[in-house]
Amino acid sequence: MNWDLTSYFPRFDGPEMRRFKEALRRDIASLKDRAASLLPLNDENASGWEDVLTRNEALTRRMSHLSSYVSCLAASDGRNEDYLKEEAALASMRAELAKVRVELLRGVKETPDEIFASFIAQHSLDGAQNYLKRLREEARRAMSTEKEILATDLGLDGIQAWGRLYDKISSRLEFDMLYPDGNRERLPMSQRRSLLEHPDRRVRKAAFDGGNAAWQSVEDAAAAALNAIAGTRLTLNRHRGVGHFLDLALFQAAISAKTLNALFEALFAHLEIPRRILRLKAKSMGTNGVAWYNLGAPIDIPNRQPLSWDQAKDLVKNAFTRAYPTLGHFFQIEIDRNWIDWEPRAGKRPGAFCTSSMLSKESRVFMTYNETLGDVLTLAHESGHAFHGYMMREVRPYARIYPMTLAETASTFGELVLTHGLLEDPSISDAQKAMMLDVEVGHGAIYLLDIPVRFEFEKSFYEERKSGELSVSRLKELMIETQRRILGDVLEPGGEDPYFWASKLHFYITGLTFYNFPYTFGFLLSRGLFAMLKKEGKDFLPKYEEFLRLAGSDTAENVVQRTVGSDIGKPEFWSEAIQSLEEPFLRLEELLPKVLPSAQS
């Protein structure tokens, strides 16, 4: 590991960590008993429920600290048995804390509206109203307390265990990488992503083929995990009276069906915009279409040099500081305090994430840096998440529970600050400008084609899963069908990725369902916000910071309306954000012939 975790605990499994866990476990048990002893919320016992809520919030803060620490350790070394054992033990402790939430659901489920309204209006609950209203909404579709507790207990060794199995498989999985020069290397799966963004198409294809051969070797286990996770959710939905499997996803995203429909109405009306981006990519490669493994690939501009970690830090810091000094200052804090685990090594889990502790008010960023421009964007993306946590550091825990739709807005806003900051630097060459424009429009293709493929695949998968488990062959077939439908003729024959359902971690995250459309939502909302920044200048930044602070205080629609005055329930908002990709696309199209001879025809 090359990050500093000592502000969590001086060392793993040391006396400080043991005492922390013992006290947390004891306090959870005490609060669980206290909550279970109370009758449903009424005028006489309001102070008792207020005490439970206050103590539960404090426990949530402490649990976030321990969870963040353990997730850092397990992700950084997925082969360490002690870390994996601690991860499983933590899941058990979280399940016990979840039982307090079950009691809270019981407490507010049948409470008359006037008593509930009076209760949440108390001064001690200022800032927690949105959390409590959502709790009541969830309570109205909850099973009996006994069944909810049973579901929590079973989840530990059921749906969550399947998720942990996938994490274990992916962190230990390796693939054969055959380079164009004939050199062969055995690599951890965590390094595949960067190779799929390599400028050389032959390298990308080798990483794609080698990676999929590895995923094929574990296809049965991956399919079993995917079927079990979805099957559990569908069963619980049925017992809770959830009408449609997307209802829970919408609740978690804090948006209405109207808003999601507006987004996809605009997206499907403008599919030709991201398809044109891919056609330009295909033209630069001298092909008529692109394979799936080319989706996130950069255009192969000559003399592209690897970017060292020090160069990456400087690029992000300078761009952030120039456009948004507060963000640049925060990024320097990340670097100075060594909050980022970036080095490639065996045993690291694939992917990237940001995790925060509500107790220490710090964040950590996990990624694997392989000297590509895409990795620099990942650094900016995850730092956007970390900055969001920094802006909310003084917000009470109940108001820090915000949806992925708004979380992904903060991260992609960070990407835009980086790309536009570099584009506005007068010292960069035409080739460097072309690279940055390629990154900006290339991300448009990912968020407007790749992510919708995930969403449409998962919808179809859940529809079919109602009738029984899907075989490996059907999962592959369904993925290919979906990729063809969304990408259209820009996807070259045979260029599909039949194992995308296995290699994509997000399908196996058990805490959130449909972990895909929030990315498209965040990408487009961030473009809308960034357009406001360009128009209003630094006068917009206080509005943006208020947007970040209020992310857990209301629905996404209301937060956006309240802070920047936009109506995201209308397709027009999303259409305008999608069409904003036209300008960088045309700039790239004009610039390419100057830096890429093959693009002159």
Residue ranges and their predicted role:
Residues M1-P302, D554, E590-Q600:
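A well-structured
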Residues T6, P10-F12, L104-K109, N130-A142, ...:
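C-terminal, non-catalytic "cap/extension" segments appended to globular domains
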Residues R238-D247, G289-W292, A352-E362, E382-R393, ...:
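Active-site-adjacent bridging/hinge elements
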Residues L280, S284-R322, G328, C354, ...:
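Long, K/E/R/D-enriched contiguous segments that form extended
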Residues R304-W309, S360-A380:
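Short pre-active-site segment immediately N-terminal to the catalytic Zn-binding motif
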Residues Q305-L307, I340-K361:
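Catalytic zinc-binding patch centered on the HExxH motif and its immediate surroundings
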Residues L377, G389-T412:
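Post-HEXXH active-site segment of zinc metalloproteases
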Residues P403-A431, E440-G442, I446, G522:
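Post-HExxH zinc-binding segment in Zn-dependent metallohydrolases
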